[in-house]
Regions:
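Short alpha-helical segments enriched in small residues
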Residues: 1-87
């Protein structure tokens, strides 16, 4: 981080598990129980909104995806990524 980064970066959340997304960002657990699971456009949007609301930041970015080495528990393929921004 460069000089003054503290004035631009409020903080961050690492919510790898579905439970963490519910506990830390306030996602409805029902949203994560759908056929597509935690890697969807809707989940990314809700994560960004939760991060914004809980951090007090004006803008939040969220990324959810499947890192690998194999598909996730919901059958989503490695490399699938959803990104959202909440303003």
């Amino acid at each position: 981080a460069g000089d003054g980064a503290g004035s631009a970066l409020q903080g961050g959340f690492v919510c790898y598990s579905k439970d963490a997304k519910v506990r830390m960002l306030g996602l409805p657990s029902e949203t994560l129980q759908t056929r597509l699971g935690a890697v969807t456009e809707t989940v990314a949007r809700l994560m960004a909104e939760g991060a914004r609301d809980r951090s007090g930041a004006a803008i939040a970015i969220a990324v959810t995806g499947v890192l690998g080495p194999s598909c996730d528990e919901d059958g989503n393929p490695v490399g699938l990524v959803d990104i959202a921004c909440a303003v």
